[in-house]
Regions:
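Hydrophobic anchor residue at the start of the ABC signature
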Residues: 143
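Conserved ABC ATPase signature
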Residues: 129-133, 137
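Catalytic Walker B motif of ABC-type/P-loop ATPase nucleotide-binding domains
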Residues: 154-156
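ABC-type ATPase nucleotide-binding domains, specifically the catalytic core motifs of the NBD
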Residues: 91, 95-110, 119
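A short, proline-enriched helix->beta-strand linker immediately N-terminal to the Walker B motif
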Residues: 148-152
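Conserved ABC ATPase "signature" region
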Residues: 60-65, 108-125
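ABC ATPase NBD coupling module
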Residues: 62-79, 103
């Protein structure tokens, strides 16, 4: 993943004005509580529209306020794992994992699903309801769902 980001966004009295370039690999944003890290992640994912800015992910412009470009979240190929884990309570772990695939109209790749399930140690949990999972298990299911969507960028 490579990203070019330049955004300006006001939330009440708070002004977020940031510009950075992230090359392929792992990039981390550090800062104190309230510094705007989550706001930046939400703008990258397309959940929040900044007042001004431009975002290029993997060479594709997903936001350019000057040109009226806004690619919606579901078309950004961005996987997002929220701070507060969000699973569908009426679905099994397996159905939660496959949700992103179904939303994108993809056919499930059994080998990739098995690889992610093994990687995250979810083999024995697939038929469980989220209400019967520990916090860590819920986090692993949410991460698996994001990974199975084969995102260009994974936002945690």
């Amino acid at each position: 993943m490579s990203a070019e980001v330049a955004i300006r966004h006001r939330q009440g009295a708070f002004l977020l004005d940031v510009a950075f370039t992230a090359g392929k690999g792992v990039t981390a944003l550090f800062g104190p509580s309230g510094a705007g890290k989550t706001s930046i992640v939400h703008v990258l994912a397309g959940l929040t529209r900044p007042d001004r800015g431009r975002i290029v992910l993997e060479g594709h412009t997903v936001l350019d306020t000057d040109k009226g470009v806004f690619v919606p979240p579901e078309k950004r190929r961005a996987g997002l794992v929220f701070q507060d884990v969000r699973l569908f309570p009426h679905m099994s772990v397996e159905t939660n994992l496959l949700f992103g695939w179904r939303r994108m109209g993809k056919r499930a790749d059994a080998a990739e699903i098995a690889r992610i399930v093994r990687l995250l140690g979810l083999e024995k949990l697939l038929q469980r309801s989220p209400k019967h999972l520990s916090g860590g298990e819920k986090s692993r299911v949410a991460l698996g769902r994001a990974l199975l969507a084969t995102p260009d960028i994974l936002l945690l």
